[in-house]
């Protein structure tokens, strides 16, 4: 079983310099939902696979997905753990976050890592 963090635990750590929230949703899911956890970084799986070296290796990375079974976040977590990162999955993903009534921000569809290159 992959290590997980509960939504309320993450909420109390938002803004913590030692925590990075990594949203691993695919572009179509990112665009469809139109919202994200405040301060999160969006990198789809392909970007994580290609560009994980840009992620901090001295922070806890909390991976957020939107697949009902959590498979997208688990896949990203496993890859990052294999590459030596300290990583956990957000329990319930984005759906769990929203269900708990926790804050979100709206975004534009093009705000991914690929826009930085």
What are these regions (language model features)?
Residues 22:
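Conserved beta/loop motifs at nucleotide-recognition and modification sites
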Residues 1-13, 19, 27-62, 67-117:
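Rhodanese-like catalytic fold shared by cysteine-dependent sulfurtransferases
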